[in-house]
Amino acid sequence: MLSPRRTKFRKQQRGRMEGAATRGNTLTFGDYGLQALEPAWITARQIEAGRRAMTRYIRRGGKIWIRLFPDKPVTMRPAETRMGSGKGAPEFWVAVVKPGRIMYEIAGVSEEVAREAIRLAAYKMPIKTKFIMRETTEES
């Protein structure tokens, strides 16, 4: 699973997810992609589950790019612990996703294969998503 090798700080505040994604909202590497339509925290496990679903479906053909990285630690307190005595220990990592963010990209496969692979990955996500395609480039 994805997680940072090292971070400047061990714990982070929760923050807010306002507005749409201003970066990472266009297809950069592949021809097809999965775009988020809602804001959410996507865990490293969910990212990996989506990647596995797509990889299994397309097998040897094509290439997949993961456009998310879980760089935010989420802390949790032990069960049945009294309040106080500081913030809990980091339990897992999440990627903050805003509407418009491209989560996965695929290239080197047909549209039908890409559509099905992206659909399988979308099932693993806790948010609404949509399949997007690169616009055909004008030849000059």
From Swiss-Prot:
Q: Which domain of life is it from?
A: Bacteria
Q: Which GO terms describe its molecular function?
A: rRNA binding; structural constituent of ribosome; tRNA binding
PROSITE patterns in UniProt:
RIBOSOMAL_L16_1, RIBOSOMAL_L16_2
Key words of the record: Ribonucleoprotein, Ribosomal protein, RNA-binding, rRNA-binding, tRNA-binding
Q: Please, one GO biological process term? A: translation
Q: Which SUPFAM superfamilies match?
A: Ribosomal protein L16p/L10e
- Where is the stretch described as Disordered? 1-22
- State a GO cellular component annotated for this protein: cytosolic large ribosomal subunit
In this chain, composition skew of type Basic residues spans 1-14
Pfam family name, one: Ribosomal_L16
Quaternary context: Part of the 50S ribosomal subunit.
- Protein task: Binds 23S rRNA and is also seen to make contacts with the A and possibly P site tRNAs.
Family, according to the entry, reads as follows: Belongs to the universal ribosomal protein uL16 family.
Q: What is this protein called?
A: Large ribosomal subunit protein uL16
This protein's species is Cyanothece sp. (strain PCC 7425 / ATCC 29141)
**Gene giving rise to this polypeptide:** rplP
